[in-house]
């Protein structure tokens, strides 16, 4: 029963997010009404509106992230560096496509949530590096890459002005990913250079 109410609240919040142009304008009362639950139930299960929205956006992101997550299962003949690159491009493309929801999630992840976004990247980085790096180095690399991309997305307007181009434009986004990967994996820069601007 408890799980049902929690799921009911989460599902109602996802529906409100899909219908809303401004996720931050959604109130706890809106969510309670849509879920047909008492207001206190939201605080009981989620402790705050921010935590609920974070979980709802995460659920929404997971539903919409099929392409991104499926990259991990692609043909193992493809070099892990290229699979990692494709995964990052899919992730960033999804973030741009669903920016009205993702901006909130990025802010929450960068400032308050547990560090979980990197968990999907660690196995690929481990494959890329083999035994050349320690586990700590692999985890720091994963965090640096993901948090840098999150920050670029979160401050897209300012970073676009700083770099002199629109960072949300697909080709420029790929260029940024290739640049970040070249910094972290210089041994593959020329071998798998895809972006002509590098």
Descriptions of predicted regions:
Residues 65-68, 106-140, 174-178:
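Amphipathic alpha-helical packing segments from all-alpha helical-bundle domains
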Residues 69-101, 135, 142:
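Hydrophobic alpha-helical connector segments
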Residues 8, 16-51, 55:
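Helix-turn-helix
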Residues 2, 6-14:
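Short, leucine-enriched amphipathic alpha-helices that occur as contiguous helical runs
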Residues 89-112, 118, 156-158:
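Amphipathic alpha-helical segments used for helix-helix packing
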Residues 122-132, 154-198:
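C-terminal peripheral helix-coil segments that are non-catalytic and often amphipathic
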Residues 28, 58-65, 71:
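Short, basic, alpha-helical segments at the C-terminal edge of helix-turn-helix-like DNA-binding modules
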Residues 8, 30, 86, 90, ...:
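Amphipathic alpha-helical interaction segments
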């Amino acid at each position: 029963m408890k799980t049902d109410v929690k799921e009911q609240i989460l599902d109602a919040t996802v529906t409100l997010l899909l219908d809303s142009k401004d996720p931050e304008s959604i109130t706890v009362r809106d969510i309670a009404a849509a879920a047909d639950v008492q207001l206190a139930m939201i605080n009981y299960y989620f402790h705050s509106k921010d935590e609920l929205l974070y979980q709802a956006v995460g659920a929404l992101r997971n539903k919409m992230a099929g392409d991104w997550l499926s990259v991990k299962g692609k043909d193992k003949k493809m070099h892990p560096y290229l699979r990692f690159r494709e995964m990052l491009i899919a992730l960033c493309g999804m973030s741009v496509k669903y920016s009205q929801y993702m901006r909130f999630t990025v802010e929450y992840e960068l400032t308050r949530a547990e560090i979980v976004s990197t968990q999907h990247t660690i196995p690929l980085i481990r494959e890329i590096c083999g035994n050349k790096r320690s586990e700590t180095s692999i985890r720091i690399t994963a965090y640096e890459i993901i948090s840098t991309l999150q920050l670029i997305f979160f401050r897209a307007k300012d970073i676009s002005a700083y770099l002199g181009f629109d960072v949300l434009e697909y080709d420029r986004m790929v260029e940024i990913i290739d640049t970040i990967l070249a910094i972290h994996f210089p041994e593959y820069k020329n071998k798998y250079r895809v972006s002509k601007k590098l």
